Amino acid sequence: MDPSVLLLLAVLLSLFLLLVRGHAKIHGHLPPGPHPLPLLGNLLQMDRGGLLKCFIQLQEKHGDVFTVHLGPRPVVVLCGTQTIREALVDHAEAFSGRGTIAAAQLVMQDYGIFFASGQRWKTLRRFSLATMKEFGMGKRSVEERIKEEAQCLVEELKKYQGVPLDPTFLFQCITANIICSIVFGERFDYTDDQFLHLLNLMYKIFSLLSSFSGQMFELFSGFLKYFPGVHRQIVKKQQELLDYIAHSVEKHKATLDPSAPRDYIDTYLLRMEKEKSNHNTEFHHQNLMMSVLSLFFAGTETTSATLHYGVLLMLKYPHVTEKVQKEIDQVIGSHRLPTLDDRTKMPYTDAVIHEIQRFSDLVPIGLPHKVIKDTLFRGYLLPKNTEVYPVLSSALHDPQYFEQPDKFNPEHFLDANGALKKCEAFLPFSTGKRICLGESIARNELFIFFTTILQNFSVASPVAPKDIDLTPKESGIGKIPPAHQIYFLAR
């Protein structure tokens, strides 16, 4: 054999051995898991069922804490209620970093409230919480905004008497309008072409991220990013959303009154001006753009999808619908809109909404975290920047807390006296320091929108209840509800 070929093989073998030794040195204290192949990681453990199915199967073999390799990238997976709460609550600071969602971060990188970590994230979260509270509790509270939107929804659905519709984008409209009123200072008509285009972009992004192709990109992003694929579609759609946000920011700048900020963007612009001499400020244009995109996206997709699943579940389980409507009729009647004060008087309806969130399980593998320092967890040393996946589905289907975890049963959230009971396994918004920023708004939206729909309409389908398929279109980072034609019949 040619000496130069032998030399090349020797160099490659040496590099491979160094890589393996380096890998063991860096990751030697991580929890055990399935043996990874070089570069491919645990690809062989995956099938068309995606990451969630893979993680649940591995939990059965390796326990509640194990390591998988997404391609060459090691990730620690946390399963079960107690494990997740121990990490995200008991070790909240250590696990407060944001992990990688490769396709989304090609554009967003580590900017904005969603993908930031460390001091940047703390600063943006503190500002966003205060600002959303200010515009949600001021002259027009979030409740008033939701009730106004609920009334608009009723009027829109009345137009479809006797005609079935897929409510996907209508439910997106109502949830998006709440966050738009806080962030952009305006609501949109349901027929506004630009608004519908923006909603379609977000829906497509969420679908692509959740697709099997999106999950494959997550495994091999370092290599696949150089080739055509799903990630380029996501980047293009993100950029269209950012173009709209940039246009809105410029309009805000042109009409800004420092004495009377109208919304989140105005308040951020004023903070930017205040800190313009601070070279280390986090209040710059990049963080504004990415924070607005994050809020717009998070405030629309999961809540609208939960509401969509809620209606599908009412179609499939009409006996539950009857009990909800009976409680609505007794507590609210038919002549006024539901209010948040009604919730404490309606334990069955509240339990049904909780069970819809649990059963629909819309963010099954949770959003990735990373540890921000070397962390000792359950006897394993997780080096700084280790990525962590808290599998929320494993809590929402935890048999230690739910008697029938794979069945839709509102009794999961009712005690022996019919009162709503709390459950520490109920983690649809995650938990700890990175719990969903908009949890309170989302819970309020779900209660008012859901009760308003069933107060005013009976739901029906051309398909028999037993034949309604709840299998999601996509299941990855999120779940995309299946499309069904639904009749909304005035009561």
From Swiss-Prot:
The main place the protein resides is: endoplasmic reticulum
Does the entry feature the keyword Nucleotide-binding, yes or no? no
> Which terms are listed as keywords in the entry?
Endoplasmic reticulum, Heme, Iron, Membrane, Metal-binding, Microsome, Monooxygenase, Oxidoreductase, Phosphoprotein
The EC category is oxidoreductase
Q: Which cofactor does it need?
A: heme
Q: Which cysteines are joined by disulfide bonds?
A: none
Function noted in UniProt: Cytochromes P450 are a group of heme-thiolate monooxygenases. In liver microsomes, this enzyme is involved in an NADPH-dependent electron transport pathway. It oxidizes a variety of structurally unrelated compounds, including steroids, fatty acids, and xenobiotics.
An example GO BP is:
response to stilbenoid
Q: Which residues form a coiled coil?
A: none
According to the UniProt record, list the residues that bear Phosphoserine: 128
What is this enzyme's catalytic activity, as reactions? an organic molecule + reduced [NADPH--hemoprotein reductase] + O2 = an alcohol + oxidized [NADPH--hemoprotein reductase] + H2O + H(+)
Q: How does it sit in the membrane?
A: Peripheral membrane protein
Name where it's found: Endoplasmic reticulum membrane; Microsome membrane
A Pfam family matched by this chain, by name? p450
According to the UniProt entry, its GO molecular function terms are: heme binding; iron ion binding; oxidoreductase activity, acting on paired donors, with incorporation or reduction of molecular oxygen, reduced flavin or flavoprotein as one donor, and incorporation of one atom of oxygen
User: E.C. number, please?
Assistant: 1.14.14.1
Claim: Transmembrane is one of the keywords in the record: no
Give the originating organism.
Answer: Mus musculus
Identify one Gene Ontology CC term for this UniProt entry: endoplasmic reticulum membrane
Q: Which gene encodes it?
A: Cyp2b9
Q: What family does the database annotate?
A: Belongs to the cytochrome P450 family.
- The residues that the entry says bind heme are 436
Show the InterPro entries listed in the entry: Cyt_P450, Cyt_P450_CS, Cyt_P450_E_grp-I, Cyt_P450_E_grp-I_CYP2B-like, Cyt_P450_sf, Cytochrome_P450_fam2
Specify the protein name: Cytochrome P450 2B9
